[in-house]
Amino acid sequence: MINTLSILIPTYNNVCVELVKSLQAQASLLYSSSDSLSSSSHFEYEILVADDGSTDERTIEGNRIINTLPHCRYIERKENVGRAAIRNFLAREAKYTWLLFIDSNMNVISHQYLANYLKEKESDVVYGGYQIKRDAETRERLKYNLRYIFESAGTQNGNHLQRQAHPYADFHTSNFIVKRSILLKHPFDEWFSHYGYEDVLCGKTLKDNHIPILHVDNPLGYEHFIGNMSFLYKTEESLRTLYQFRNELQGYSKIIDYAHKLKRWHLYPPCQYLFPLLSLPIKARLTGNKPSIFMFNI
């Protein structure tokens, strides 16, 4: 049974006060309702937000409100160390047995979010997934947003039964609970200092060490979608990360599999010739008013 929980939120240039307030309100209710229980069943919690060297002073100032909330702490760090290192830092700072990692751009969509995790059967790692809004108003407002189109095209993450069929490949490093002892023994690889694929390697590490992942239906919401140009930049950055760690991620990326097929079919040279000629028109289409998921996948 999970009765001590450190909620860990890395952030960068993003005000996440509302997320923290939502989590703190739920945790406070669980804390109060457990007062009458035995000491072994009493719920204890903390919420730690680590700022990974934000450059926007307004977001830093905005997040300082977190320090006024019970059991909450906002940790300001001057140096940007990257997604892996900041998570390892939070794990070391945490004082409780169980860790819940959440990205700062997500939001709580269920009043029973924390309670749902606490009632799950105990597993070394539990992943709850995420979901995006698909109502008519949101679809109309974001119909030209490439990130939204990309996420809408995928349905796998919202279905925990589908995810459980491929527990390591469909694992992400936001909205998951893990034993602190496990993460300290198998930390995030800090060579991943840039964006992308640290969650894939984390899943691979868990599999290699025979650590089970339980997939459950307990999603967080994802509704902050960056612009098309920024999303393309992030995608290119993640592909550079993938190339850098292509040996470590062998068998865990369809892109690597496709690259091997191109080599095997002797199509690598034509692709290397054509891509510089086509990349600018493709980027123009992807950052325009009618981005194509087909062109993005190319």
Per-range role (PLM):
Residues 13-37:
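Short, well-formed alpha-helical segments that are part of the catalytic scaffolds
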Residues 99:
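Short aromatic/hydrophobic "clamp" motif used to bind/position activated sugar donors
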Residues 146-168:
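Short, flexible, basic/aromatic active-site loop/helix in glycosyltransferases
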Residues 194-202:
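Acidic donor-binding loop at a coil-to-helix junction in glycosyltransferase catalytic cores
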